[in-house]
């Protein structure tokens, strides 16, 4: 459900379903996921909380509500609550690979609990070893753990396994190459990343102009 028309159809279907099954949790998933994708976070949270209250304890759908609430909270910068939701998801469904990936990546961005992050993304990769998103996350966890040579291997694999690599992948690869001493190649990757980025790219432009990451000591 990444296409706008699909999310619209899902949202409308959820509203229709809710008319007939107001006490079932499924319609609330159908409504809240499109809202989450559209970043209508408060409305998504409202439906998720209603659906969560209707979900049987320790059920797969309850785990799903916890996971989506975690995403809402994280996007609202309510990090502790987000991570508590992800922990609740994984207590019910330890093999939820999307939660394992996202939780791991968020921890790496905050440079927190990197051992836990590595275990989670390793589990996700075991289930889907050619998933470029998971490979990117694993590479980034390794990068934050200062395991630069292994990070390079996994980031290269992430790019090779993605038909249309994003600017984020190339930027990550540039950062990793830089820390492996390959500064010229790093700048090339940052330049390539800039071609794919539409939003504000101040940090990326700094890297290209100065030949080093923003927080790197000269």
Model features per residue range: what roles?
Residues 2, 36, 67, 74, ...:
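Position-specific recognition of the canonical hydrophobic site in helix A of tetratricopeptide repeat
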Residues 5, 39, 77, 111-112, ...:
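Residue-level detector of the short coil/turn that links helix A to helix B
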Residues 33, 71, 105-106, 140, ...:
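Residue-level recognition of tetratricopeptide repeat
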Residues 20, 54-58, 92, 127, ...:
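Structural marker of alpha-solenoid helical repeat scaffolds
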Residues 27, 61, 65, 99, ...:
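TPR alpha-solenoid repeat register
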Residues 30, 64, 68, 102, ...:
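Canonical tetratricopeptide repeat
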